[in-house]
Amino acid sequence: MLDQALSLAIPSVFGQHMHVEELNDLETRILSWRSIAVDGNSWYEGKFIIQEDPLSGLNALKHDSNSQNHDIGDILLRILNKAIQLNPDFLSNKSYHIETKLDFNRSWGLGSSSTLICNIAKWAEVDAFELSKVSFGGSGYDIAVGMLGGDVLYRSPSMWEGYVFNPPFKEQIFFVHLNKKQNSREGINSYKKKEVSKKIVD
């Protein structure tokens, strides 16, 4: 997929839900975030301050000084600030509390990142593929599946279409979790160092 080979992508029945609560707190505008795992426990909590960038005049987010786990927070910060660039009206004049909830174990690798990006893109009314570029990267096939909510034939963000995958053997297809989930960004960087035959891709 990273070399635009024609690929079939199929969503799982599990997903990620996002609830947005708007708060009329204009004195200090805050965006608080809580990510909840399938077992009901929080696996990330953070706060961001929303303020106007004096150079661009746009809203911009920065870390609250008390926030922890900045690795995840940094990724969220990039995604949300990119969403503001794509839609300057996003996050205007209010504070927000966001909760996300996974239907699956994060170690399964079923798309906690891509479903997050799709949810934020729908909320901000922006292009999910553009948000993906500043966060996790990749081919974008999972973004297409997440935005459509169904099967897709995929080559690139500009070359994909919906598809109905309904073979007679569909009841014999199973998901087997090997407990070998890898870091997506590291896997992509490792793949890009390899030479791939154009004949195979085509």
Question: Whereabouts are the PLM-identified features?
Answer:
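C-terminal nucleotide
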Residues: L2, L8-V13, H17-K94, K101, ...
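DPxDG-like acidic metal-binding loop motif
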Residues: W108-F129
